[in-house]
Structure formats: C-alpha cells, structure tokens
Amino acid sequence: MWLRQSSGGGVASAGHGGPLRQRPIDAATDCDPRACYDSFCKHWQQAFEIIQHSAPPSHDDVLGVVSHLDYMVTLLLVELHHCNKVSLPAAEASGPPAAPCLEFLLSENLLDKLYEWACTTGRYANAVRLEQLKLYELLVSHSRHQLLCHEPFLRPLLKILASSQGEIFPPDLEKRLVILLNQLCVVLMQNVHLLDLFFFSAQTQVQEQILNGNVAPPKSGTTTNFIIFSLLIPYVHREGSLGHQARDALLLCMALSQKNSNIGTYIAQYSSICPLLVTGLGGLYSRLPNSIEISSIDWHRITPDDVTEIPELTLFMNALEFCNAVVQVAHEMIKQQLLDFMYQGFIVPVLGPAILQTLKGKHFQTNIDSQISAMSYLDLILRSITEPGLLRAFVRFLLDTEKFDGERILDALVERLNSPDANLCMVTMALFDTLLGLHCEDLMLELLLKFMLPGKHVPISHRHKINKIDPYLNSSEFFLDLSPDVMKRARDLARPKSVHEPVVSDLTPLPSLPSPVMSKTIGANWNYYGVHTGDSLYANIQAYLFEAHWRIAQCQRDCLKWANSYRYQKWPRHGQGRVHAHALELARQFFSEFGGGPIAANETGEKQLDSLQSIGESSGYESFKWRPADEESEATDTTLATTASEADLDHNSSSLSSVLGASGKREAWRTSNNNRNELILTDLDFSEDLFAQGTVSLGPFLNAIWGKLQTFTSNSLYVNLHLTGLITRLAWYPLPLIHSLLLRSDIAITSDTPSFHQVLRILKQQIDAELPVTEDSLEIIDVARSSLIDREFRLANARKGNEGSPMHHSQQQQMVTNSYATLSAATPVQATPTSAYDPFKRSDKKRRSISKSITSMFSRKSASTSTTPPNGSSASSGLSQIYAFFTGAASNLVGNNASNDGRGISQAQTSAGTCETSLSTQPQAGASRTGATATSAAASGSNSSIAGSTLTLSAQSNTTTHSASTLHGLDGGPSTGGFNSEPASLDSVASMGIIASTSGTERSRDLALCAVLMDEWLKELAAIAQEQSVVLVTEQGSL
C-alpha cells in the first residue's frame, strides 16, 4: 500500500527540497482516513525523534525533519480536501473526528514544538522556516478563520511572524512570507472581529522569547504593534509580483483602518508608511529620464505604451497608483497625514524645481527636452490620479505663491504657451487641456474668470446681455459664415443638395466654376456609411450637436458643485443704494464737464442706463441709451454666489490638512479657495470704465491662446489641432461670461488684443486672399480632405483587425495598406499590440478608463510586425480606390500607374517614418444616429478638436473622448521603437501623381490644409453655440 511505502521510505526519497506539490500523493486521491492519520502520526514521530536527539542539528537532521514535514503537509491537504468542515479539538466530542490529522496537530501542540526547535537550527533556520510558512499557508487557505481562534495555532503563528521582523530573507522565503501575510489580510477583512488577535504588546509577547535567548529585547517605549502591517512595509516598493502582493495586502490593511480605529491610530502615529511612500515616490521620480526620446512631430504626451517601455516610469506609476489608492480607502488620519507628506515632501520640493527648472533658487538655462519631460510627467500624474484630495493638493501646488519666491507654477506654464518650439508648445497645450478637463473652480478663476468678472472687456451698452440669452439669436450661422470661400465652393461642388446640414446663403456670390463629373480623389464623391463623403470629414450636424450636448452636460454637472455661480452681476448686494447714488453723481459730473449742459429734465421719470461704448467695429464714440426696466431688474436679480455658511467649504483655514482634506457632498478640489462674499461686482466704476475702454486685458492665458490663433496659417498641423481643441474645451463651459466671449456674435469685446471673433474674421480674410476659388485650389482642398479621411479609415480598419483574430488582423492590415498606397505611401499602416499596463484604468465615474481596443491603436510596434503589400496601387480616381478599399487588391483601373509596386511602398515605409493620423465621424457613446464611422480618440480628456469632432492626436487624458470626428495618431514605425509622423504640410501628397497637374505652391497646400481644419472647427463651434444657447436659455427660465 502506498501509505506504508511512504511511511517507511519518506526520508530517503524526499529530502531534496522539492516543491510541495511534487509528491506521489494527490489531494484528490481516494484514501482511507485512518491510514492517513496513522501515516501522519508516524511521520511526526520520526521527525520528533530527530528533534530530541540532535544537540546542534546537523545537515542530515534538518533534511530529515523537513522531509517529514513535507509529507505531513501533503497528508493534511488530502484530509482537508475530503472534509467539508474543519473539526477542531473538543473535550466532549463524540465519535471519530472529521479531521483527525488536524486535531492531532493542534492537540499535541506540534506547531509550537516545531517553532522552538527551529530556533536552534542555526544556519539551517531559513530552510525550516520555509517549511513552517508552507504549513501555515496551507492551513490558513483551507480553514480560513476557524483556526485563528485557537491558541495552539495562533500562538506559534504570532511567534514566527514576530521573529521575522527586521530579518533579511532569501527571495523564496520572502515570497512565502508575503503570500501568508496577504492571506491573513484577506481573512481579517472578512472577519473584522479577529483583528485584535494580531495586536499585542511587544514587551509582553517577546518576554518569553527573551528568557529563552531567542530574540533581542524590544526597544524602550514599544507600544501596541500590528504585526502584519509592520512586516509588509519593507516590500512596498518591491518590483514584480512580490511588490504587487505586498501592496495589495497593505491596501487591505488600510481598508481595515476604516473599520477599526486602533489600526488607523497605529498606522498614522506609530508606523512609517506615509514618509516611506513619499520618499520612495521622490526617489523613483529622480530616476525618470531627464529627456524623453521624441521621434515624432506630433508627440505631445506620455501614453500607456511609453509607460510600459520605460521601466523607471513603470515603477513610478506603480508607486503613484498606490498612493492614490491609499488616499481612497484609508482612515481619515492616514489620509490627512499622507496628503501632508505628499505636498511637503514630494509635490513642492521635487515637482516644483523640476517644472521651473531651478537650481538653488536661481534660474538657469536648460534645454527644451528637460522642460518637455517635466511637463509630460506632470500631465501624466494629473491624468492618473483620481482622488479629490490628491487633485486638490496639485491644484494648490499650481497656485502656490509662497513656495517658489513669489512665482507661481501656473504662470510659468502659461508663459510656455508662447514658446517657439512646437513640441514644447504642444506638450503645454496638452497639459492645459488636462487642467481644463478637471473643471476646477480655482484654476478657471485664475486663468480666465478673474479677468472677466468685472465685465470691463464688454462695452457698457452690451453688459446687460451677458446673462440674458436671446433665444432667437442664431450664432451658428455666424460661425458657418466664417468658413473660407473655397470651402463653401468645394462643398457646393462635392455634394448633392439634400444634405443634413442647413444651407448657408452666401452674401457674396462666388465665381462660377465647372462642376467636375468625378473628383480625382475618394474624398469627394463616395458615400461612407450613409453619409456623403463631403460630410464624412464635415460630419453630420447631428453628430456635432450630440457631442456638444454631452460635453456641455458633463461640464455643467461639475460646475454646479462650485462655490460661486460666476454670473455677471449688475449691482452689488451690499450697499446697493450708496453705489447707485455714487454712480449717478459721477454721471452728472461727467456731463457737466464734458457734455456742455445739465441732464435732461425727464431723467427722474425713467431709469437711465450707464455709459457705453459702441460696437467694436465702430468709431468708439461713447453714447447713452435708455434701457427698459425689465432688463435692469433681470440684471439686478441675478445672483453671484450662494451663502457662505457651509462649514465644509470654508477654505480660509491656514493649515494644510484643512485645505487638502475638505470633504462632503461637493468635491472640494473643484471648489474655489476664495471666500464667496468677497466676489462683489459692479460695472459702474465710471472713473475707470469711461477712460480705460480698449485697454482691458483678458489675462495672459487668453492672450497667449489668441496669439497662437493669429498665427494659425503658419502653425504646424498638430499645433493647430491642440489649439483648436483647447478653445473648444473652453467653449464647453456653460458659464455666461465665457459664452459671451467665445460664442456670442451680438456682444462686442474691447480688449488690448483682437477678440476671438475678430481673429476668426482675419483668418478667413487671409485664407480667402491667398487661396482664391480656382480649380487648382479646389483640387488641393479635395486632396487635403481626402488624405485626412483616408487616414481615419486606415486607423478604423487597423482597430478592427486588432479586435479580430490574427488572420483577420493580417488581412485587414494588408487591405488598408493596398487601398491607400497612393495617398500615403510614406505612412505605413501598422496594427499594434495592446499594452499590458494601463495606469489610466479607473473605476471612478469621473475618470473613465481607456478601452484596450483604443489603446492598441496607439501602441508602438516593431518593424517585424509590419507587412509589405504584395502589390502596390497608384490609383488616380475615386472609383479605383473604392474598389481597393473593399477588395484590398490593386485596382484594375490604374492602368500604367501600376508600375509603382510593393517594393517602392516598402522602401517608403522604411525611410519616411510618418505617423498615421486621421479623421473619423462618430457619435457619442457609439450611437448610430449620425451614421458615422465608429472610431474615437484614445483620450481621457485631451480633445484637440477641429470642429464637430474633437480632433485628437494620440490623446490620453482624464476623461474618455467620444468624438464626432477625431484625428488620431497611430504610433507605428520602423524598428527604432519611436513614433513616426507625417509632414505638417501636404508635400508628400503633392509629390504623387494624384495632383501632378496641380500648380499650387507649398504655401497654398498648407493654406488648403488650414482651410479644411478651420472649416471643420467652425462647424463644431456652431454646434456648441447652439447647444449652449439651449442650456443657458433653460437655466435663465428657471431663475
């Protein structure tokens, strides 16, 4: 019988330290319980004989005991497998026990005897300890919490855990210890009443061990110790699975602190976990590369694949994720302490100098690469953390004026918007896109609202319109009319009359041109997914409205949590009568001095409107106007702020903990630090208003944005994408002040820089002048549209390939490569694997995670995975490309142009390193109402938009982008491992035979691309203006 054989030959056959489960005994083996019990007792008898007769144990003695323990563990496993319920020793138990081996183990106190002997094994102690940990791991995993209640099991377990403190173990022993501690944390999480069993006085617990000479005496002043947590702390920054298991167990302990205040007190007051986490985070940050390799013209932020490819960044993100999770689940004392340490020990001393690039308080010239990397790391951090407490700490860091010699981080970031370096500019705009996506009141107040609240940028005659929305005002037509003339003409020629978009009548008739029977590119005549090609780039207006509605609603929900409403207020609430009288007196003095006569006698019978300045395009002379009573009462009744009596929103406390730890129903980090009663506004300060018009500044942020917008036609493609996306994100805010600045065509703006609408008019005039409506211009426009549409379909097909089988993946990749060889021979289509690491995955509803399929579109790929098409095609007509699109083969309509074979395409793929970027049409949340292409940007908040579609380039940020028409960046390329990107202009397209007959210059081709992007962006602004009007009119009716 196998039991008898194992009983007699166990030592000889199993003393080589083999794995626990590599035994002839199987847990599922059908066996006799009595035979198992006899064999178990026999093995212990032999092991105990060795223990008793070994003065100092020799190598053979230790090997023999370990072998017997291995068999005993296996027999216990067999017994527990056949027992439905663990039976523990009982004095009055009748009948045979259900688990006789386990009962013998506990009744004979075997675990304690084994521990006492292990303390005498000297250099073999680790081998014996490993077997002990295996035994405890097995018993805990199968008995769960039942054994923890019994002293014969708990006492030796606490002894072995206490003796493990401060010890350095080999990797296999560390692994077993962490696994056991993790199992104990899981059991305690399910049985909170057992927590007190693992709190013990170190002096009392170790006293017996001191008498036996086993351990050193405890330090003076030792207090209650949570032994499990103490043992896990050294492994918090470990790499690999060991570190993950340790951090998981520590998080369980943090969650337990919410249920047991003793644990919270111990961790906050007696453990070193908070300073250890913060110092480790700072150390990991210092190991990050000072310069990120940028091999792409459109790179603007760190993606999940970048995190995976940079080991130092992976470790840093693991530590940051852990800190974020601790703040989320820990006790309030631990949370406040960690936030305090984070701010004082990492954010200010580590991130501050890195972003400001300072050395000993003095600025020094540094290269652009280090600035780009520091800002990219900050952007990654802001997109990764989700806890309001941490977010508030970073917001305070951006606005702090005391820590950096009076200089604010936010001001330094705004200055970099004006950087001539395109990469630094794009990274800065991506960072501001993330900041605006936080919907934080303090940030918006510092960037925009504090410059707009006085209302001095609006002529006095128009200020009463800020809060009052005219339901009959059609701002959409205003933006659509700003489209360049060549784009209007191209739409008229490229689409039938029956389209979803309303027809905009042109005031100036365009020159008549012959309508081509068939466009030379696929982008003008093919009907994709039920939407005409002319509306594939220029998406269905319903898609724009759907996107705008969802974005505005999301922003409105967050802004409702703000402390102030930020509606322009005509009269102050306090001292209203005195201010009114003082204003009238100033007006009388003004007329008596400059008007040449007294005020009319009938002024007492009517309400007089204050001084105003005429519309921005007029001569600027000031006049007076009589306003109806209902307008004044409307302006008077609008409220600026709610009451300031809520204690949870009092942000004037001087302590950091009170600022960082504000909690309640509102998200404190979104709420302003400013006292709401201090924001009392008036526009009747005649001493400044009447003589300062035209010199009002909108702040450095808007000035920088308008400055970049004025150079729209000379910017690179990707800078314009981020620029338009940033302005679009501002337009989503349902605040009357911002709405009046960006979307109201009936309100003039008087500031020291051209207004937004004036800049748009200038851009239209510039494009109309340099790109007149000619056949050559229309052909270049057609190519520009088609190239963007073409790239979107390549990305869409690559994504479908990633979602399917490997065979489908390969076929799809080859199909799109063949289909679009003509328009993008220099842009290889490469499907890329998904990243295993996703630091942006969240369960928080405010920060949606990025899907694996979308992430795969942005992952990098080596050259070995790219495919070379067997046959190249150089289609010169839309029909040939349509045929290739559906078949993946070269078109038979190409004729002599088929000489451009696959070898040429392969060479272009290897030499030109270009980034795949494209446009798609997609409604929000995958809705089919728009009939558009179902692709979306891999973005969590970065929406570099061009018109109805949030055009994004490899965007990864804090909210998921559901865009109507999105410009993606596919990070493919050669074996260098870097991003590849396409040229900013259409030179590569123009060099192909498709527009060989075009006589346009490089400047005209760049202007054509700008015209396409501007036309798309204006349609998005039109949709946002319409939706914002609906939202504000509805809100106005509810007041």
Curated annotation (Swiss-Prot):
Keywords: Phosphoprotein
Keyword GTP-binding in annotation: no
Pfam families documented for this protein: DUF5917 (PF19314), KELAA (PF19311), RAI16-like (PF10257)
Compositionally skewed regions (Low complexity) per UniProt: 925-945
Region span, Disordered: 831-877, 904-945, 957-984
Coiled-coil annotated spans: none
Residue ranges, compositional bias (Polar residues): 855-877, 904-924, 957-966
Domain of life: Eukaryota
Residues carrying Phosphoserine: S498, S805
Family: Belongs to the FHIP family.
Protein name: FHIP family protein GG24907
Organism: Drosophila erecta (Fruit fly)
